């Protein structure tokens, strides 16, 4: 309701809880190594239980492979959408995290095929290029503004590139993706007299 409320948003949820919930109903492989650690760790989990654990040599960062979602709770399978829809939702979630953290390299594979990889160079424009594609990234304009209580920074499209829907809008508050009708309406209002009609 105010700029103070925006400043108070810290995390918008704890992702670790979601990871534990996913691991409880799937088969998961995790490989991870901190920057200053000489070795990494590999875990194989099945239904939330650790089946294998070992020290390994691996690159810095974390890789998670999730397979056989709901293998141990078949009743839940009937509530899942088609594979394509579930894959699209997972892809969108990775896109949002990649855009909010350009300093981290993300790689998204579906059925063994790489669909996206960000460089992790800390530059938002590089992440935009990897996530949205060359054509879209090159058409965007940087924008930045600040007031007494808040600042806004990002990229906007030229009015000639506007879509008829909100699918290309991505809003982040303190590094977290948010869906906000208020922000979307404000963006539409700002563009109202700029859109090309026809």
Descriptions of predicted regions:
Residues 1-198:
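N-terminal phosphate-binding caps/lids of nucleotide- and nucleic-acid-binding domains
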């Amino acid at each position: 309701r105010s700029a103070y409320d925006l400043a108070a948003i810290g995390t918008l949820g704890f992702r670790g809880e979601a990871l534990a919930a996913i691991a409880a109903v799937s088969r998961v492989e995790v490989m991870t190594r901190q920057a200053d650690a000489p070795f990494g760790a590999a875990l194989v989990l099945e239904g939330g239980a650790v089946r294998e654990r070992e020290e390994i040599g691996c690159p810095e960062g974390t890789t998670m492979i999730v397979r056989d979602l709901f293998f141990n709770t078949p009743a839940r399978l009937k509530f899942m959408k088609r594979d394509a829809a579930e894959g699209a939702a997972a892809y969108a979630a990775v896109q949002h995290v990649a855009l909010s953290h350009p300093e981290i390299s993300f790689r998204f594979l579906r059925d063994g095929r790489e669909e996206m990889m960000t460089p992790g160079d800390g530059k938002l424009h590089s992440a935009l290029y990897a996530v949205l594609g060359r054509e879209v990234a090159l058409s965007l304009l940087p924008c930045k503004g600040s007031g007494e209580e808040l600042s806004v920074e990002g990229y906007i499209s030229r009015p000639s590139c506007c879509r008829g829907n909100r699918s290309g809008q991505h809003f982040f508050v303190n590094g977290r993706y948010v869906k906000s009708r208020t922000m979307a309406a404000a963006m539409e209002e700002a563009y109202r007299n700029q859109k090309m009609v026809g």
